[in-house]
Amino acid sequence: MGSLPSPNDPSNTFNPMDLTELSTESKLVVDFITQYYQTLETRPVQPRVKPGFLTGQLPDKAPFHGESMEVILSDVNEKIVPGLTHWQSPNFHAYFPASSSNAGLLGELLCSGLSVIGFTWSSSPAATELENVVVDWMAKMLNLPSSFCFSGGGGGVLQANTCEAVLCTLAAARDKALNRVGDDQINKLVLYCSDQTHFTIHKGAKLIGIRSKNIKSITTKKENEFKLCPNDLRDAIRSDLEAGLVPFYVCGTIGTTALGVVDPIKELGKVAREFDLWLHVDGAYGGSACICPEFQHYLDGVDLVDSISMNAHKWLLSNLDCCFLWLQSPNALIESLAAEANFLKGGSEMVDYKDWQISLSRRFRAIKMWMVIRRYGVSNLIEHIRSDVSMAVRFEEMVAADDRFEIVFPRKFALVCFKLSSEKTPPGRDSELTRELMERVNSSGKAYLSGVQMGRIFFIRCVIGSSLTEERHVDNLWRLIQETAQSIVS
């Protein structure tokens, strides 16, 4: 194909891997991205567009003849970029970050450029072995027990996201339970989480055939900091056992989405061991912080855990996508997900990652994460997280010092949850006015915050996490919030 002449014009040879073009056009793209980042701070964080804005600007049929990279990038700049929510903006504080870095971006380029598919060891040996190395490196950075490392009998895999990681562990736990009680008992399988657990667990449970009524969300309480209570979990398990059901899985979290709650891993682990349940820990957000020694106490009891996942693309500068999943005993996962086709067999004692994930094809994510760790070192990754936490502490202190506001939940990482004070707003209107405050801030284009409705309370979430955010951006955000509140609260 690369050297096949055009039937209409033999002198025109189509070569999709023209290396001269690659060198020239990649520079155009890198320059475009650089300019985008240079202007990012001045752009409205959220786009001011309406549904269908892009459809009307693009042709309804694909171009028959190719176009130049210059023309394509011009359309990206004029038609695509104005409709983006700028997740890398230093003023983006709505959701947990999709962290970006030079090394992550260039590692992504290497991943795409090498374009290997390491579904078995033999299909690309270096891809598999580098992934083995990287997941062990990260396990040691988190100070996980050696039993989670390949060198200690466990192991890990890089998934695309937490949804896929959780789904894999659910499938493994389901099959492990059914091997014990029989396949005909699948409708009796029950899993447990808290009402603060990410909806990923509900989605994954449905995909593996768990009935909705058997997904038990245990109510959390403010006086217990909204943690999943081990005693409540134990009571729920006992009740279900008495009803003839089969408890098989529990999910704890390090850094929930709404509040940043950290569940008591050690105590949950004891309950899981008592009743032979699979315990998974979702560390999608807060897990990354545990490379810092001051946060590693949140992992106390992790030796009682069957699996743990963490999104490096949230806080460890890897760019999307990169999710670590570790298991103490990978065999249950492999037995559940193994592909048996003869042509897929690796024929070696090495890991075949096709048996550690849902899909067969897989990206060379390890080279990107390896590049990030090597380029910055553990010390700079720790400093990056500490810097974000420090700015979050600064923001929290400014909010707490203004009597028009109140902190909803004690900050654990770099998420600050706050609202207008009920004492400074008309009776019963604090949530309504807090929502109005958030909407006005967001509509200004100068910042982007998110909100949560929890019971009758509405509060604002402010996450510090963009790689470009500096103290001045946090100070500017606080001034914007104060000025906006002035027109809402007298």
Swiss-Prot record:
InterPro entries from the entry? Answer: Aromatic_deC (IPR010977), PyrdxlP-dep_de-COase (IPR002129), PyrdxlP-dep_Trfase (IPR015424), PyrdxlP-dep_Trfase_major (IPR015421), PyrdxlP-dep_Trfase_small (IPR015422)
Top EC class of this enzyme: lyase
What gene name is listed for this protein?
A: 4HPAAS
Task: Give the record's biotechnology entry.
Answer: Yeast engineered to express 4HPAAS together with Pseudomonas putida DDC (PpDDC), Beta vulgaris L-tyrosine hydroxylase (BvTyH) and Papaver somniferum (S)-norcoclaurine synthase (PsNCS) accumulates (S)-norcoclaurine, an important precursor for the production of benzylisoquinoline alkaloids (BIA).
Q: Does the record's keyword annotation contain Lyase?
A: yes
Cross-referenced PANTHER family: GROUP II PYRIDOXAL-5-PHOSPHATE DECARBOXYLASE (PTHR11999), TYROSINE DECARBOXYLASE 1-LIKE (PTHR11999:SF169)
Q: Which keywords annotate this record?
A: Decarboxylase, Lyase, Pyridoxal phosphate
Catalytic activity, EC? 4.1.1.108
Alphabetically, which GO biological process terms does the record hold?
Answer: amino acid metabolic process; carboxylic acid metabolic process
Which cofactors, by name? pyridoxal 5'-phosphate
Q: Which reaction does it catalyse?
A: L-tyrosine + O2 + H2O + H(+) = (4-hydroxyphenyl)acetaldehyde + H2O2 + NH4(+) + CO2
Tell me where in this chain the PTM N6-(pyridoxal phosphate)lysine is found.
K314
Which residues of the sequence carry a binding annotation for L-phenylalanine?
P97, H198, H313, F343
Keyword check for Hydrolase, yes or no.
no
- Please tell me the species this chain comes from: Rhodiola rosea
Role of this protein: Catalyzes the production of 4-hydroxyphenylacetaldehyde (HPAA) directly from L-tyrosine, tyramine not being formed as an intermediate.
Q: Which family does it belong to?
A: Belongs to the group II decarboxylase family.
Q: What is this protein called?
A: 4-hydroxyphenylacetaldehyde synthase
Share what the entry says about its subunit structure, partners included.
Homodimer.
List the record's Gene Ontology CC terms alphabetically. Answer: cytoplasm
GO molecular-function terms, A-Z: carboxy-lyase activity; pyridoxal phosphate binding
